[in-house]
Amino acid sequence: MFDLFSNVLFTNGDVKNPMDVNVTSTMCSVCGSRSAFFFRPYSGETLCQKCFISSIEKKVQTTIAKYGMFSFDDRVAVAVSGGKDSISLLHVLTKMDRTHPKASLVAVTVDEGIRGYRDEALAIAEENCGKLGLEHQIVSFKELYGFTMDEIVAKSRLKEGKKLTPCAYCGVLRRKALNVAARRVGATKIATAHTLDDEVQTMLMNIFRGDISRLVKEKPLTDEVHSRFLRKVKPFCEIPERESTLYAYVKKVSFQDVPCVYSNEAFRNEVRSMINRMEALHAGTKFTVFKFVERMRHALGATLEKENFVDCVDCGEPASSGLCRACELLKQIRCI
């Protein structure tokens, strides 16, 4: 497991360092007036807590501007799972009013219905939204689909032959639920907390699978392909996962640190381990992969045909054929 805190130099009592690294006298390379607690291998910086927090917030502002993620009057639905990344993103985006004073935020959480896991996450999301004074919309699988995730998993395990993983069902159903919930609250865009690590892992997985279409589509700001598909933005796409986590610790915000009981994507875990080993040996590898794919996307996109959508015959949402993918999966579950 790649340790998220391996670059923490020391603690002054505010941040617990699980590695128990000895205290050093290194000074912050930005302000020069406070002791550093974090070393950034890819930039060579040593940062104090204040400059670290400032660097994350400035980087997100730069990323938003770089990709033109927000319009001046956007209503942004922030996908909040209750985990470290989504909670960190929520707190960073509340500062957006400095640059986008007419924009507004609303938090959206999808309740998949996973007993012993989602209950805690919902409470944490609600707590953070309350502290930030944000509206919080919750949409559940049970309400939308008639099944909880626990029920879907139980039924899918009765299926004969090749079975989809719980993550395969959940990913499709969550994306649809998030889009529906965001439209309900009048959002114009959806912000997700995909970090640099998430993006690079997905890029490599798509390359290994030869999936050019997904490689092109999954941009920091997705294209507008249908009026009922809200565009998604990824303000954390250039923030390493360990820095998103450390931001939450330094800010002392509550988040869920227990992994989902169904999370077991073997392929993603293999890719994660590989890219983390490369990053440890060659600092900046993740940024290099990310920037390379970003440069390739425009050229690759020209080779793809434009998607045509029809209305799903079951739910009326946009679909590439008679049934949208979510309704296809639900139909399979109902037939078991």
Which residue ranges define each predicted feature?
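Flexible helical/loop "lid" subdomain adjacent to adenine-nucleotide binding pockets
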Residues: 57, 65, 75, 189, ...
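ATP-dependent adenylation/nucleotidyltransferase module used to activate substrates
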Residues: 2-217, 238-251, 324
